[in-house]
Amino acid sequence: MTHLIKIWLVCIFYVPWICFGQEIEKHVIVSTDSTQLKALLLHPNSMLSTQPRPVIVALHGCGGLYSTSGVNRGKLNPRHAGMAQLMTANGYSILFPDSFSTRGESSLCSQKFSSRKIKQSHRSDDVDGALLWLETQPWADASKIVLLGWSHGGSTALRSIDANRQIVASRRLQPSAAITFYPGCSDALKDNFRPQIPLVMMLAELDDWTPPGPCIQLAKNVGASYFVYPDSYHDFDNPVGAVRLRNDVPNGVNPGKGVHVGRNPITGPQAWDQLLLTLRKQWE
């Protein structure tokens, strides 16, 4: 790990709100299902506004983009703020499409799959809309776009790169790779998923919400890369908080018994370091 990466990871994982200070641009992106989406965009401070640069399209999980309580309510939550800081510090622009607010939701986590009005199909439409929007942006390097998704957003990334879907295979602007943190892989496994582009998965050994087993099998089936982080639960890369039991989540390995979520202060920074290394290797 380089000295610069160490500095930024310490900053992000211990004092993310003090470190975070970039200007956030607000945009409207049209999903391919015609929904107008809010989107937040951050650029590296060190680059000219018109200078082409790599872009990360960051896909939030079932809890949405924002903090829901405290003084930072309505702002990027710590995980997204920390990732924005990490990416922009290393020369990447990062785009956060908000799939929930204009559809009247703030979170899906406590909803059963069968009752959710926002489906993975809506969210993959949002990815397609974001890619179409990026095609029109002169600062976006079309050859260096990566999808990054957590949990529900990770599953969205899987659907968004599945070569079995015609819209994926025929895109004009094709992402370079997809990187996912603890996605749900069971549906992709059943649907004979075929990645159009390279796929890397960051998985939590003890995850009882979206268990690593199906993702490991999926990776072996399709030749994807994966990393399993020991002694880690869902949301282990969150830069704040501690492991807790969420009894309000009905979907998990043990329905009705809740799921464990929360930060691992050792493996979380390791995974974000691996993310940076993966991005660099992608474009060597």
Annotate the PLM regions:
Residues 11-21:
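Hydrophobic h-region of N-terminal signal peptides that target proteins for export
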Residues 37-38, 52-136, 240-241, 246-261:
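Serine-hydrolase catalytic machinery in alpha/beta-hydrolase-like enzymes
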